[in-house]
Amino acid sequence: MKVRTRIAPSPTGFPHVGTAYIALFNMCFAKQHGGEFILRIEDTDQLRSTPESEKMILDSLRWLGLNWSEGPDVGGPHAPYRQSERMGIYKQYALELVEKGHAFYCFATAEELDQMRAEQQARGETPKYDGRGLKLSQEEVARRLEAGEPHVIRMKVPEEGVCKFNDLLRGEVEIPWAQVDMQVLLKTDGLPTYHLANVVDDHLMEITHVLRGEEWLPSAPKHQLLYQYFGWEMPTLCHMPLLRNPDKSKLSKRKNPTSINYYRDIGVLPEALLNYLGRMGWSMPDEREVFTLQDMMDNFDIQRVSLGGPIFDVEKLNWLNGQWIKGLTPGQLLDRLLTWKSDRSTLEDIAAAIQPRINLLSEAVNWAGFYFNHMPQITAEMFESKKLTQEQVRQSLQFAIWRLESQFTWNNDTVGQTLMDLANQMGIKLRDFMPTFFIAIAGSTSSTPVMQSMVTLGPDLTFARLRHALEIVGAPSKKEVKNWEKLNESLKLPKNEATSEA
């Protein structure tokens, strides 16, 4: 049996270091066993999936030095490798489960399910599908299907007993069936959920080992059932420990930048980032800290993975990157520097922004320096304003982050309109609103136009600077976040609707 592993990212945002971490361990495991590592795009979420995000994911993984033998960009014997191009496959398997008696139709509306959950919570129960679709007679199901009523297909789940499965790192794992929901397999629009598409594709693509984050442990019983229902052999499972912030919380962009592109843009070498991710819960037999991808593949053993949550510490990453930089010759370092900021389009944008402001070429350093710095040097006092309260400064930064995060098109129009709309909806004049962003992005109110600067820097560096500024002036508490989310949404409503909502 040839070992086959995969990474299956969803193209719904910026490329996450967690994706690279799981991809690295899948690739090393496959190479250790003389097997194959493939890439599949799981884009069943048609509302949030974008070609731009897919391209960023592929480019960032390639930049790191990860390679796959099959995928949407290189083809292969199991093509297509985008789930959106495989939609016709999933429905037939869902219907097969219905015919075998392992799945059923459910006609419950969203409102009915909301009421069901509310009643369960009122009784102190954990919200869970109550199996109402199982009570329908075959005649009623046939009649409602004939009438064209909206419906989903759900999988049947045992009501009693315990699901047992083996994990490469954890040994035998037990999860009571009572904790497992009757998962939707096919949605009302005919699209599959993650669980059905994942199992079908792993089987058809002959995946033998699934290395994934431990957040998928609760889903393993559903997947085991589906393999049993289809009569297929389930791949060997291995649930990797999650990357964590220094405070042991799950790695999140609120506390640490999580985009691969961010670390590339600030000057982290791909070898160093891959080296650092390789040390997340794993170590070389000789315990050395600096090693190459080839070193890791040559010495890889999955049993050396520690289940303690690995800490993603940016300071440690910076130190490791420094070791890699110090190992370069001056000529190699120059090549890396030129490659780091070699995009002519970006440099032309910077030149155009500073051109009206300089009389000597040497003055370009002062005006353009913030484009190349890791993070501007700012203090809370710099944000003090006669026009805005501290609350308005904090909210303007947080609201801008939330709104800009939803923009997949990053240009002058989208960035500019987002900020202008926010200022207008908050009732703040633009000239009073923008200094906060000049300071957050450039470290000074004397700078090139800040909206253009944000576009030139790109979303990853922009978000990092806005979040850094928010930390400086005071990030919202969990309670404030909930209240601010509601306020941010209400600001988008027409004034009469916002008033009635209040």
From Swiss-Prot:
Renumbered ranges of motif 'HIGH' region: 9-19
Pfam families xrefs: Anticodon_2, tRNA-synt_1c
Job of this protein: Catalyzes the attachment of glutamate to tRNA(Glu) in a two-step reaction: glutamate is first activated by ATP to form Glu-AMP and then transferred to the acceptor end of tRNA(Glu).
Catalytic function, reaction form: tRNA(Glu) + L-glutamate + ATP = L-glutamyl-tRNA(Glu) + AMP + diphosphate
EC numbers for this chain: 6.1.1.17
Positions of short motif 'KMSKS' region: 250-254
Keyword ATP-binding on entry: yes
Naturally occurring in which organism (per UniProt): Acinetobacter baumannii (strain SDF)
Binding-site positions, ATP: K253
Protein name (record): Glutamate--tRNA ligase
